[in-house]
From Swiss-Prot:
Organism: Schizosaccharomyces pombe (strain 972 / ATCC 24843)
GO cellular component terms attached to this protein's record: cytoplasm; cytoplasmic vesicle membrane; cytosol; endoplasmic reticulum; endoplasmic reticulum membrane; plasma membrane
Compartment annotation: Endoplasmic reticulum membrane; Cytoplasmic vesicle membrane
Protein name: CDP-diacylglycerol--serine O-phosphatidyltransferase
One GO process term, biological-process aspect: cellular response to potassium ion
Transmembrane segments: 42-62, 74-94, 127-147, 212-232
Coiled coil segments of this chain: none
Function as written in the Swiss-Prot or TrEMBL entry: Phosphatidylserine synthase involved in the regulation of processes such as cell morphology, cytokinesis, actin cytoskeleton, and cell wall remodeling and integrity. Also plays a role in the physiological adaptations required for stationary-phase survival.
Domain of life (superkingdom): Eukaryota
């Protein structure tokens, strides 16, 4: 008896084709839905949880801005900005589990997840770091590039996720580059600085090249390393 064998490459192509067809069918159903609030109707429970992730990220940004508006006198707002980010991480973990548990995903699910992650783990940590004292021109350029690295990493994930090997539950087996929520480690470093009163002019290792256009804080190099790790293609991080 002859057994047919399907190569892993062909299987991945078949899975990707099936997912593409499913996405096209969902898109057609959404475009042809002329009911009121069709956008809201298209959202699933997992999408609402993803929106909570984005909500926490936006609230973190507002809390950081409140700290700056207070004349940097009330650390209460800065701590609030920091506390919102772990809640965003909780919702980021939860939305995927709920989607797999219910066996349902919406047309916008993956895009919503990436956009929410960009706010909560890209823009929010950068604004938080700025409020902690990374405020020179070069600091802000580096923080901007850090956010762009997160944006690029998420865009790459969206276009390549179908080609990444999956486990039995349909979950990707690894990440290409560090996932963007790992940027919370940088937030933790900033939190330790706040706790020890090492912010603004008291940041560890001070300010280099002061009173020049190239002034920067050495600690901002951590954001450079994080951006490089996120955009690396050779770095494979097992997905838990």
């Amino acid at each position: 008896m002859v057994r047919s064998r399907v190569s892993p490459g062909l299987k991945l192509q078949s899975d990707a084709s099936n997912q593409s067809n499913d996405k096209e069918n969902k898109l057609l159903a959404y475009v042809n839905d002329n009911r009121h609030f069709s956008l809201i109707r298209a959202l699933h429970l997992a999408d609402l949880i993803t929106l909570m992730n984005g909500f926490c990220g936006v609230m973190s940004i507002f809390s950081s801005l409140r700290y700056c508006l207070s004349g940097q006198q009330s650390a209460f707002h800065l701590w609030n900005a920091m506390y919102f980010m772990p809640f965003a991480l909780f919702f980021d973990f939860l939305d995927g589990k709920v989607a797999r548990w219910r066996g349902k995903s919406s047309l916008m699910g993956q895009e919503l997840d990436s956009l929410a992650d960009l706010i909560s783990f890209g823009v929010s940590p950068a604004v938080f770091a700025f409020c902690c004292g990374f405020q020179t021109f070069l600091d802000t350029v580096i923080l901007s590039l850090f956010v762009l690295c997160g944006l690029t990493r998420l865009a790459r994930f969206n276009v390549s996720v179908n080609s990444i090997p999956k486990d039995g539950s349909g979950k990707s087996q690894f990440f290409e580059g560090t996932p963007i929520p790992t940027t919370l480690s940088l937030v933790t470093v900033c939190g330790v600085c706040i706790l020890k009163g090492k912010t603004h002019e008291n940041l560890p290792w001070g300010e280099w090249c002061g009173n020049t256009p190239f002034a920067f804080h050495p600690l901002v190099v951590l954001f450079v390393l994080s951006g490089i790790a996120m955009t690396s293609k050779k770095l494979k991080v097992p997905k838990i």
